[in-house]
Amino acid sequence: MYSTNPGSWVTFDDDPAFQSSQKRKDFSLETQGVCRPNGLKLTLPTLRDPPSTPSSASSTPLSSPMVDFYFSPGPPSNSPLSTPTKDFPGFPGIPKAGTHVLYPIPECSSSSAPTTAGGVGPPLLLTKPDCSPHVSLPSSHSHTQPTPTLGFTEDAGPQRVQSEARQFEYFQDHCAFSNPFWKDEGSASPFPLDSLASRKPFSPKDKEVPIGHKSLTQCSLDYICEKLEHLHSAETQDPLGDLSMQDPYAGDTVSFVPHSLFRSQPRAGWSFMLRIPEKKNMMSSRQWGPIFLKVLPGGILQMYYEKGLEKPFKEFQLDPHCRLSEPKLENFSMAGKIHTVKVEHVSYSEKRKYHAKTEVVHEPEVEQMLKLGSTEHRDFLEFLTTVEEELIKLPATAKPKNKSYEEQEICLDIQDSLWGKVTKEGQLVESAVVTQICCLCFLNGPAECFLALNDRELQKRDECYFEKEPEKKGIAILDYHFHTCVKAEEFEQSRIIKFVPLDACRFELMRFKTSYEAGELPFAVKSVVTVQGAYVELQAFVNMTPAAQGSPHAGALRSCNNIMIHFPVPAQWIKALWTRNLQRQKSLKAKMNRRACLGSLQEPESEPVIQVTVGSAKYESAYRAVVWKIDRLPDKNSSPDQPHCLSYKLELGSDQEVPSDWYPFATVQFSMLEACASRTEVRSLGVESDAQPQKHVCQRACYNIQVEIEKKWIQVDGEDADKTGGCVTQ
């Protein structure tokens, strides 16, 4: 009746269709049967058979339902009790436990004519679900088949095989059992909390991989496994396949340190998540829905149901009153977290408050317009940068008539963003400072404002603005960009910024670029990773620099706030940073351990994987890195010169999980209030009137530093000496 192959695959020898298909010499790749991972090999009819062939001879009827013993609970997939459903559990295309997902039949391109059986009728195209190999869509073919059949057209054959191979690979990565024909690759991670968030949906437009022709029978299992191996190796060689080893700003066209005022790059769009319904409602719950998002010139947000559609289902026009909220990291599902941001509409109203002293204030009224999210950190940062740069390019709006304020006010917010690269020796080799000046005005009438900075060119032309400190040199403005309300011709002549501000609207007045002349950062970061066989240990040390400890500008010690240090983790190491239980998987987390301070003689009873002396550290799948968070430095409970350290130790399964071409960089982000990295100062601010409004100037500096991690490779017995590369060998 049947015979078993050495690979535990069962084939029916008495099936006439199977015997006849083996005798055919022209049995091509497009017409072969596909091996199913449930232990059965189904032999399927060819599309080139003549129409006179009876349908009963092309398949084997099933007298009883085929039970899938691995995907329980639920009735058999081909029984009347099984109802195919399609749901969105958090990630597109990933079904919930106990459900079966039916995927639609891809449409053929209009340029290629599909071929059918006998040349008549629609093409017979069926796709295999990811997690349920027995469920398939019914065909609209004229001949009724008792069992589902699978075929490929001549034009879409290679793409179809590639789709099948990728679905089989996904099935391999996330199943609870193994198969002797599946090869365990180091880059495959069986932990869904990171792999599902980083996996991209398959697109039929992906590039095809050339496969060498071998003297193998095309309907044999070895041929199928050979093709899957080639497809898998092509994916691992894709430079965009493993994002865990890439920096958010790494690439050929984008550098970590910006070389211009505008850092956004032309993009066709991003795959985002939209919070629906858009506004909170007491009668309904909100959920995430997948969309494809585009940002057009002029501040137009276009949202599509999926990539490739011609017309968007929604358009949103940004106006000068719109702004982006602070980015947050929120729980998405069991598969990890999501980066979220809100598009808000902000308006201001004047109110009188009665406290111990009566005062008039201008309070903002915030209305949420959209809430967007993304599981890809790099796409999320690109979207934020693009929207911020589109807002400064919007035209100015006219002020409403007959609107007056009881209390006039001008507020300036100066923010410096420092971008720099630091070598493993601690030297700052590349840096740039981009300064953004935001303005908020409440003025009566069409008043014209003026602003004078400590510009070096202004110091040469008019020294009256530098009478108090004539020996202090001004800053060199390398490049600048103004809002549309600024009179650019006046600035070229007098180096004084004159503008007619927007009424009750916070807008970016100008941005300019300067060089970082301080020469020393507020604190230094030193990172070392040691590899010895399959044992990996990373150590990071943080200490305040002498310049930050003795700041001459303020009596109190300036502090660095909201410090985040990201240490990238290769995909092969993720499984060592997760713990499992019956309910879920969770990341290993380390909080402040006083006994792990430098110079301490006490050792903990059980040594954890991650240790820190201040703050907290854990693996964040949203960043694909170990994130060390510190609220404030210097710490309140330690002296300013006290160094702090982080250490995490991993015992990998094999030394093959350590990539030899891994050159990691740690990313450091923090902010300082009442600080200035560009040395920008306001020399004069006011309006062309005798009655001057109240003036408020706030300054802060945001630092983004990329630090090179030193690699030390300790060679063990039997290890290839060439694997260490340029690392230090002890």
Swiss-Prot record:
Main localisation: cytoplasm
Region spans: Disordered: 1-26, 38-83, 132-159
Organism domain of life: Eukaryota
Record SUPFAM superfamilies: Second domain of Mu2 adaptin subunit (ap50) of ap2 adaptor (SSF49447)
Molecular function via GO: cargo adaptor activity
Domain MHD: 407-710
Pfam families: Adap_comp_sub (PF00928)
GO cellular component, one term: cell leading edge
GO biological process: endocytosis; focal adhesion assembly; focal adhesion disassembly; platelet-derived growth factor receptor signaling pathway; regulation of endocytosis; ruffle assembly; substrate-dependent cell migration
Biased composition range(s): Low complexity: 54-65, 132-143
InterPro entries on file: Adaptor_comp_med_subunit, AP2_Mu_C_sf, MHD, SHD_dom, Stonin
Family the UniProt entry places it in: Belongs to the Stoned B family.
Other comment: In contrast to other members of the family, it does not contain NPF (Asn-Pro-Phe) sites and thereby does not interact with EPS15, EPS15R and ITSN1.
Free-text function comment from the UniProt entry: May be involved in the endocytic machinery.
UniProt protein name: Stonin-1
Gene name of the encoded protein: Ston1
